[in-house]
Swiss-Prot record:
Residues 28-44 have a biased composition (Basic and acidic residues). GO terms for molecular function: structural constituent of ribosome. Keywords: Ribonucleoprotein, Ribosomal protein. This is Large ribosomal subunit protein bL32. PANTHER family: 50S RIBOSOMAL PROTEIN L32 (PTHR35534), LARGE RIBOSOMAL SUBUNIT PROTEIN BL32 (PTHR35534:SF1). InterPro entries: Ribosomal_bL32, Ribosomal_bL32_bact, Ribosomal_zn-bd. It comes from Xanthobacter autotrophicus (strain ATCC BAA-1158 / Py2). Signal peptide: none annotated. Pfam families: Ribosomal_L32p (PF01783). Residues 1-61 are annotated as: Disordered. Residues 1-16 have a biased composition (Basic residues). Belongs to the bacterial ribosomal protein bL32 family. One of its GO terms (cellular component) is large ribosomal subunit. GO terms for biological process: translation.
């Protein structure tokens, strides 16, 4: 069975765990509609992605 040769210091343990934190998602303002959306994702309100119509826009209710 594998046994560590040295005790892991709190600093090293913290550095290892630093990559485990959840990142806050980034948002960009859409040029056409002004709505916030994720980068590299299509805008669900307008149905546009990179200047092209991908989906039909949602009907205003």
């Amino acid at each position: 069975m594998a046994v560590p040769k040295r005790k892991t210091s709190p600093s090293r343990r913290g550095m290892r765990r630093s990559a485990d934190a959840l990142k806050q998602p980034t948002y960009v303002e859409d040029k056409d509609s002004g709505e916030l959306r994720r980068p590299h994702h299509l805008d669900l309100k307008t149905g546009m992605y990179r200047g092209r119509q991908i989906l039909k826009p949602k009907a205003e209710a």
